[in-house]
Amino acid sequence: MGKRMQTYTYVSKGKFELMEKPKPVLMHERDAIVKVTLASICSSDLHIKHGSVPRAVPGITVGHEMVGIVEEVGTAVKNVKPGDRVTVNVESFCGECFFCKKGYVNNCTDENGGWALGCRIDGGQAEYVRVPFADQGLNKIPDKVTDRQALFVGDVLATGYWAARISEITEDDTVLIIGAGPTGICTLLSVMLKNPKRIIMCEKDEKRMHFIREHYPEVLTVSPEECFDFVQANSEHGGADVVLEVAGAESTFRLAWECARPHAIVTVVALYDKAQTLPLPDMYGKNLTFKTGGVDGCDCEETLRLIAEGKINTEPLITHTYPLSRIEEAYELFENKRNGVIKVAVEC
């Protein structure tokens, strides 16, 4: 009998369970097996738990945010080798289809492309994970970067970095970011690299507002109730030049376009539990450009370089650490936003 391991598994709607499964094996020449050293819980995992991700397959190991050590590689893998410390990209991508060649890797057309890990195939809240297309999905961690510093490179930081990149931010802009959760903060860190004139962070949770003020004092903060008037008072052209919606609520979706100036860019980063309405009659004349900022993992090597250079630091987001054996406690803490939690690291 092959080696078995502990995994956190999607059993059915509303139910995850810690259980034993066989250790994964190579299934394709482009696969790698990674010993997971550190994983994290993402809000997308909660969406799976609550049945909001129809493509999620019951029985799979959840988790798509992790780092680890390469244990074994397929014969076609060239960029990583056993012993390498690596980040794991949430998106699997072949590197060869139309969308991959354009750099839109989250739209990879391969059957294992897109968000597969922890959704359609076994993910990384486990001791080991099989990573398809390892040359594309794994990035070597620089020696000077710790696992904790690199933990978010393949998911929430990739999301924030991609969203900032497609938002066409200039140094003259007022940028509004709605939502100061983990992805919102990673979006903030990525926007700060663009050096806009001012950044406004909108958040309803006072503890998260305190976190922003403590760590990023140059950023203006405001509650949702006061956001519209505050943005009007702190922008030159009747609203924000760029709005990034990272909160994922019906009210924040509306707030995003309301706070945008005419001809602004509104980038929707959030994942919603239900359909949203775009009230075109109310918006008529604003001539807004909407973009969607789903995670795209083509910049992970660049973000690792920026971390190594000290230009991005996501480690303060890790407020709690649990062993895999206590992952149910970690989920309860994260889902209920207790004790000032922002992100939880899970030692596997």
What does each model-found stretch correspond to?
Residues 1-5, 204, 229-230, 254-258, ...:
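C-terminal hydrophobic helical "lid"/dimerization subdomain
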